[in-house]
Regions:
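Small beta-barrel nucleic-acid-binding modules, primarily SNase/OB-fold domains
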Residues: 35, 40, 71-342
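Bacterial N-terminal signal peptides that target proteins for export
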Residues: 40-58
């Protein structure tokens, strides 16, 4: 139970002038200013990329990871120190706070008035099959956290336009006597959200993807809803009514096309009908800085996440390697790839 002043659970996520319950992802949204603004934000996020390394693991597995991996995962697994040595200035980015409520975006409202957005989480939306999916996820997280203290490490000094501060957050989960653990990882393990790539989640990327994969395999939380199933690149019906929403698509790249303006990963022979992934020219440099050769994706199975654009056939624009998982190293026994028809 939360403190006496906590709002009703059905009010999670409400802000003046906003009604989160009116949004329904199964209705195709306008492809106007809203969609363009979302794409602009994703492109801007690419500028924060600082580089990394392409690591091959085994004969049949390729993973995109960022060095130094061991150090990064240690940083992901530990809560930040909650104090400074005597005489040393306190770190303004590190702190602790009491959670008073959790909204439907899985953001944590603290007793001091701050609102934390947990880095690495893409919270669920209402779906045709479960209009309360977002509420149920927030209630579960609230059961863990409301009335409890969380440790956090802020990833930015100023809140965004929604008043949120991106942060890594840590707290005991389930048993208050248990050690504090990363809340993003715990939420993904329970299927309360999907992994969201970004600078703030980069150090924890491998651990967070593994947590998401476990929940997906066990059909926990949102993964029990068919709406959130990973879409096969060749399943055109799977893209229906999802334009402008965040999707995860998996398939084999049959060709890589380069032009003066973009590089396109092609998944099928019918241009304008089959799925494709677009990387704008300015973002190809980000892949190069990470040691990722886009041509190397040809013939490989990859998993891509991003906003779905249906204006010229199903496609997703990615801004950096964080948004792609390469899950095989080369072609399997399915036979040679088919070149696209022009």
């Amino acid at each position: 139970m939360g403190p006496p002043n906590a709002p009703p659970r059905r009010a999670f996520g409400w802000r003046p002038g906003q009604n989160a319950r009116t949004w329904r992802p199964h209705r195709e949204p306008s492809r106007g200013a809203g969609f363009d603004a979302a794409m602009t934000l994703r492109r801007a996020a690419a500028k924060a990329f600082t580089g990394g390394a392409l690591l091959r693991a085994g004969v049949g597995v390729l993973a995109l990871a960022y060095a130094p991996a061991a150090r990064a995962q240690e940083g992901c697994a530990r809560a930040p120190p909650l104090g400074a040595p005597a005489g040393a200035p306190a770190d303004p980015l590190v702190g602790t706070g009491r959670v008073t409520f959790v909204n439907e975006r899985l953001e944590l409202a603290l007793a001091d008035g701050r609102l934390l957005r947990i880095a690495g989480l893409d919270p669920p939306r209402p779906t045709p099959g479960d209009p309360d999916l977002d509420v149920n996820s927030s209630v579960k997280l609230a059961d863990w956290l409301v009335g409890e203290d969380v440790a956090f490490r802020l990833l930015e000094t100023r809140p965004d336009r929604g008043g949120r501060l991106a942060a890594e957050a840590f707290a005991p989960v389930g048993d208050p006597a248990s050690p504090a653990r990363p809340l993003a990882q715990a939420a993904l393990e329970a299927g309360l959200a999907r992994f969201e790539p970004g600078e703030g989640a980069r150090n924890c990327r491998a651990a967070l993807l593994a947590a998401e994969a476990g929940a997906r395999a066990a059909a926990l939380g949102l993964w029990a809803d068919p709406y959130y199933a990973v879409i096969a690149a060749g399943d055109h019906d799977g893209f229906a009514e999802k334009a402008g929403t965040s999707v995860i698509v998996e398939g084999r790249v049959i060709d890589v096309e380069r032009s003066a303006y973009r590089t396109t990963l092609i998944f099928g022979p019918r241009r304008g009908w089959d799925f494709s992934v677009t990387i704008l020219q300015r973002n190809t440099k980000i892949f190069g800085a990470a040691g990722v050769d886009l041509e190397s994706f040809k013939g490989r199975m990859i998993r891509v996440r991003g906003l779905l654009d249906m204006r010229f056939g199903p496609q997703v624009e990615v801004s950096g390697p964080d948004e792609i998982e390469a899950i095989t190293q080369a072609k399997d026994d399915a036979g040679p790839a088919t070149a696209p028809r022009r």
